[in-house]
Swiss-Prot record:
One Gene Ontology term from the biological process aspect of the record: negative regulation of DNA-templated transcription
Keyword Lyase among record annotations: no
Highest taxon listed in the record's lineage: Eukaryota
Tissue-level expression: Not detected in leaves.
Record flagged with keyword Glycosyltransferase: no
Entry protein name: Protein SPEAR1
């Protein structure tokens, strides 16, 4: 009795409730329930807005700084900031923040090989590390350890060398001081 359905609702009531004429009054109620459910995500969720605004702000700064590389005389204070000193924070991949590692900001073509960009998530800034004289670094890496001991004695450091571990500490101090 009403087991086949060809497009016309069965009035007897054995058909599914969505096709009966009496269920049409309950369909706005279910729609109304869906409206209430869809309104909840429209309310701002805490914490997401700040992160999104920060991301937009950083993208805006990157756009300004990439323009800065074409006209370096427009923003001299930006050039000074980008040529800052060394940082002890290692380089990290910045792809999760929407930045690309090969994108250089405010760095001229002749400085391309000497600049390292790194993202520091704890401070929320993009840091640049410039090696102004890369030959000095290479010189220390290839240097004989006995010559560094002679240099530390000639500098008058006053440290007595009793073992190889102290020599390594002195070498680290010399590298950091330069």
């Amino acid at each position: 009795m009403g087991s086949t359905f060809f497009g016309r609702p069965n009035v007897v009531g054995s058909s599914p409730p969505s096709s009966s004429p009496t269920s049409s009054s309950s369909s706005p109620a279910t729609r109304r329930g869906k409206k209430n459910g869809s309104e909840k995500p429209k309310q701002p969720q805490r914490g997401l807005g700040v992160a999104q605004l920060e991301k937009i702000r950083l993208h805006g700064e990157m756009s300004c700084n990439s323009f800065n590389s074409y006209n370096p005389s427009l923003y001299p204070q930006e050039d000074v900031r980008m040529q800052g000193g060394y940082s002890s924070i290692p380089s990290q991949s910045s792809a999760p923040y929407g930045f690309y590692p090969n994108m250089m900001m405010g760095v001229h073509r002749d400085q391309y090989d000497r600049a390292t960009m790194s993202w520091n998530p704890s401070y929320g800034i993009l840091e640049s590390q410039h090696s102004l004289e890369p030959n000095i670094t290479r010189h220390f890496l290839n240097e004989d350890p006995s010559s560094t001991t002679r240099r530390s004695k000639s500098l008058g450091s006053g440290i007595q060398h009793s073992g190889s571990s102290e020599n390594q500490e002195v070498d680290l101090e010399l590298r950091l001081s330069l």
